């Protein structure tokens, strides 16, 4: 649960936060630093506490214990309207009777900003989200993506130190969501404002974030860059939650050198990279992403290195061919190969006998643990 160790200055510090609802603890002793100008995503399954963290930062909920510090000021007891943060909700929460301009100007008017200053600031914010020509329209005259942008313009117009986004893209269709992911990231870079984004969508988190926090049961399971989270999961929960992954049972046979061991993986002997302190007989988990696995067809009882299995399912997805391989042990393995129509070995036949292999050192090795 340690905050990221970076030289950047934190704009938000959460120290020992606890929060319970109806006697059930949702957040347990949470510590987190969020750096100035960072795009941080809090990722986790429903009920993990991610939205509660956002609400504690915004001031919509009060913590039972701990501190919320924003820009070096303890705001734990400060009401939401006096914190330098704005929130974009999943529902957008636009005022239906107001025009786009009036929606964006609302917060400035509440702050008693002079009318001469309001118009240029609102139009600047609308230009930033490419909606300046829509200023006279009402929300019902806009598409879902345009309403989303109005909500963002309204949130950034009064220049908050931090922008909080709670599942803000989940109501959009797939194509629009992908477009908004790109636009949000570009907007964040342009503004230099710290964004804290809450989602359960792993792909969204990987594509948008500078840093990801993976949560479970009110605790931080892993804190790292998107690449670290995907390629170097610290436990089975993170590995299974982020994308697809194959988990093989392995038993240590002997250590070969500081970095490699010989192990029995699903009944076949293989060299694997493992820097854990292990001894002969120890149980391990060997993790491989579907795209890291290679298949070699076995014909005419020829000898092949690898774990033996049979092609049970094939799904053509344009760029990739996804296969399900049933190993001799009964385990199912997911494989994703780039589809090359000129390669006769890629388009495997159903029930084809294959050897499952991978490039040495691409595997992630974890100590055996209870299934997450």
UniProtKB/Swiss-Prot annotation:
Chief place of localization: membrane
Quaternary structure annotation from Swiss-Prot or TrEMBL: The complex is composed of two ATP-binding proteins (PotA), two transmembrane proteins (PotB and PotC) and a solute-binding protein (PotD).
Catalysed reactions, semicolon-separated: ATP + H2O + polyamine-[polyamine-binding protein]Side 1 = ADP + phosphate + polyamineSide 2 + [polyamine-binding protein]Side 1
Residues that coordinate or bind ATP: 44-51
Location of the ABC transporter domain: 12-242
PANTHER family according to UniProt: SPERMIDINE/PUTRESCINE IMPORT ATP-BINDING PROTEIN POTA, SPERMIDINE_PUTRESCINE IMPORT ATP-BINDING PROTEIN POTA
Topology versus the membrane: Peripheral membrane protein
SUPFAM superfamilies: MOP-like, P-loop containing nucleoside triphosphate hydrolases
Family, as annotated: Belongs to the ABC transporter superfamily. Spermidine/putrescine importer (TC 3.A.1.11.1) family.
Gene3D superfamilies: 2.40.50.100, P-loop containing nucleotide triphosphate hydrolases
GO molecular function: ABC-type putrescine transporter activity; ATP binding; ATP hydrolysis activity
Top enzyme class: translocase
EC number: 7.6.2.11
Superkingdom in the source lineage: Bacteria
Subcellular location: Cell inner membrane
Alphabetically ordered keywords of this record: ATP-binding, Cell inner membrane, Cell membrane, Membrane, Nucleotide-binding, Translocase, Transport
KW Cell membrane (keyword) present: yes
GO cellular component, one term: ATP-binding cassette (ABC) transporter complex
Xref: Pfam families: ABC_tran, TOBE_2
Keyword Repeat in annotation: no
Role of this protein: Part of the ABC transporter complex PotABCD involved in spermidine/putrescine import. Responsible for energy coupling to the transport system.
Name of this protein: Spermidine/putrescine import ATP-binding protein PotA
